[in-house]
Amino acid sequence: MSNLNVTALIGEMAQTKSDSLEILTNIKNIHDVLSASPTNQNLPAEFRKISVPMIYSAWESHFTASIAVCFRALKDINKSANEHSSTIRAIWLQQESFFSKYIDMIKNIYDIDSHKSLSEKMTNMKRKVRKGHFKLTTDVLDSIDTFNSTGLNKQVNVDDLVMTFANVNKVVTEMNMDVIGLDHGSLDLSQLDALVGLRNAFGHGQFTTNVGKRQFLQMLSYADQLVNGLYQEVEVWLSHLDSELKDTHVDSWRCDTPCNISFSHKHI
């Protein structure tokens, strides 16, 4: 029996959408008030500059929360890890202490010899892979077998699974959506890198950059579209996941490639 509560997850995501859209609305309202004021006409222009990071933040906040909701949904499904896609397993595997320990060992072996030639590295590699390393590798393989045959670790903080790399730009957005199985083609990501770039410019003190009123309003509208578009895509994904889980004729809720499922009926 799955512990998936789609209604609660959609409700949680709807709240993050509402919070982000409220920020965008407030930014526009403040700008309208400043623009209507007869005194100090420089204020609207300065406000547009300092608002850019907030406009971007409205997008990032909703994005990270929405992706985390998807991971929470996958965590709540009572399926063994090997019934999930390789990308989902890779995300969860990176959180396992045994895997991190093994990666650290491999990095240790190579980092020590980083200045040496490839032939020297390989020679030293043979010497370094001693009994302890062999034992650790064996333990890791056993642990991976156990990992694959049991459910995804429910103790993992799903917020830590979201890959942001400091900026949620076009590549990062597509990467996270691909991992889960969301259609990033449903979003218009054509202006996202420009928004991130402008946000970073102001974040690094490039205050001479000007943001015109038309550009400002376009950014607000674009961020609004991104937030709503992602919400709709995740809502569809959650609803589809819920439907597949309830379909007793489907052996697994997911397929790496499009599934052609046919059913045979025996008549007695």
Regions found by a protein language model. Give the residues of each.
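A generic secondary-structure signal for well-formed alpha-helical elements
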Residues: 59-66, 70, 74, 206, ...
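Extended alpha-helical coiled-coil scaffold domains characteristic of the BAR superfamily
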Residues: 52, 57-61, 230
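Charged alpha-helical initiation segments
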Residues: 1-53, 65-91
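Polyanionic, low-complexity intrinsically disordered segments
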Residues: 2-29, 156-268
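Amphipathic alpha-helical interaction segments
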Residues: 64-67, 100, 107, 238, ...
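Hydrophobic transmembrane alpha-helix bundles
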Residues: 32-33, 104-124, 228-231, 246-257
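Enrichment for repetitive, rod-forming helical segments
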Residues: 24, 55-56, 133, 206
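Helix-loop junctions and short alpha-helical segments
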Residues: 55, 67-181
